Amino acid sequence: MKGMTEHRRRKRKRARHGHGRKNQRLFLLLICMFAGILIAGMVAGTVYVVHKWMAEPETVQSSIGTSAAQTQIGTDITDSAHLPVNDMLTGVVSSGEAVADALARQPDKIALTQDNSADFLKIESCEISAKTGKVDISVTAPGIAISDDKYYYLFNEATYADGLTDEQESIASIYKDSEVSFSVDLNNKKADSRLYDKFVVAVKKDGVFLPISHARYITNPEAVATYQYSGMKQDSIKGLLVDPTKVAGSELDDLGVNYATYNIPLARILGGTSSAAYPTITYSYDGVTYHFNGAIIHEYDYLFETLNAKGIDIAAIILDNASTSAYPEITYPTARSGSTAPYYMFNASDEAGVKALSAIASFLAGRYSGDGHGKVSMWIIGNEVNARKEWNYMAATDIETYTAAYTRAFRVFYNAIKSVNGGAKIYMPLDQQWDRNWSKNPDYDGRDMIDLFASSLRKYGDIDWNLSHHPYSYPNGNAAFWNASALVTQSADTSMITMDNISVLTDYMAQDSMLKTDGKMRSIILSEMGYSSSSGQELQAAAFAYAYKKMVANGHIDAMMLSRQTDAADEIAQFGLALGLDTVGGSHKYIYNVYKYIDTDQSDTYTAFAKAIVGKNF
């Protein structure tokens, strides 16, 4: 019996040992299974993350924020090593779900067609980074464009280019996604500067690069500006086309002038000088050296400093009358001959033209934004640019070609000036022709031109352009602008804009299509306007009084510059226009005191006479 009992005891012990070994093996198997599941989840998550984020050394990384799924995957993988088995299993499941969710949210792959390829991608912004000084370009897409490889390629195009060339190379590449961004060097003030370039994104399709976005320019050149001068704080809109021979005197102080316009014809400032006191100014910009007449520049220095000292803000008008033999690159190719117009279309149609315009604009902005030479807060590019034949000559062409030429030149001036003085305002100037629709007109309607101008700027990257207008009466000698005229109506399709219907202009500029990117109205100045005393000095004065009151009541006119301080003998001889506050001989006209007191507490006293002449109570 004892032997049997011992035998059974040993048998049970062996059985217990056998069951223990089986339990151990089962436990180890479960651990291995858990570990395998965990590793599989980690690998799947890692593969997904690596697939999404791994980039080759020469590619630009995507700036997309980390998604919730990607964040969860990373968190699960990092924390799993420190969790108990049950929590580890939960983490594995969570990781797997995150991976599945992320995979499910991958952008659709879309085939490119003739209908969708040109604007498949949208460049949302193209701006200079305040932190890095590089050009940051943000892009969105409805999905992943199907092409030869997995990349989007970024190209830069010159201002004058209208597409990619066969030999052109990309400046950056990135893995495709529905949202990507590039960051490239600006190379400001270097020979290969990209400040005036536009940027476009392409894919490689059938072995060649196919652009799939609309090109876009840099829209914030002010990010690299040295100066931020935006003008003085003025208490009225009163301005004047000043007489340079009277700047040093007391008349401008007596008149209480706040704003002044002054021309800068390029023929005056370009080239060398033999003056020992004011030698030639050598200026290098973007790898090219230019020369400015030191003696003439000194004259502008004195003029602008003197005006500023009198509390007067300046609007400088840059005009192209440069010699087409000495400086052909400044003038548009079809404007270099065939006209006796005083000024020509600027040239941004080739590299030499862009470099010349940008250098001139950069030089002027730099000289007249800091201390020591006077300051200019407003820059007007050209004169009455819709008046093609008379004031901004270019060989006759369609309005689209003409406006495109001006728009490109304007943007060059804009980027050059704003990259030096971020506070400056840049203006496009129009005359009073608005919507004539006259088939024999050698000029263009201002409405048509500004529509094309604004649309192009929006399409290629909107900027803070502004409007300068000349609402002369029609005809110009008609001082009584309030009298009815079939050409001057209160509707948007009026043939002419004068001070009688100036609200048509400001209402038009209040449309959504004309507003700045922040939703505000653009600056509007009346940089040239006036009334002749040829039909009587009191009529001239009454016209000014009524016009000024209308401008103030309108509320959207930032400044008005009356033409002019002193009658111009050539205008009287050629056109019969005596527009000045003073006669050629220097005596004050009736308008002098009206102008002087129009923005003071004595305004009503000096304008009361005008109500009977105008026939209106204003």
What are these regions (language model features)?
Residues G91-K131:
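Short, compositionally biased P/S/T/A/G/V-rich stretches that sit at domain boundaries
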Residues S193-V208:
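Short, aromatic- and glycine-rich surface loops/edge beta-strands on solvent-exposed regions
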Residues G133-I146:
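Aromatic/hydrophobic beta-strand junction motif of beta-rich domains
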Residues M1-T78:
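Gram-positive cell-envelope targeting signals
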Residues E390, G536-K550, N554-F618:
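Aromatic-rich peripheral "rim/lid" segments of glycoside hydrolase catalytic domains that contact
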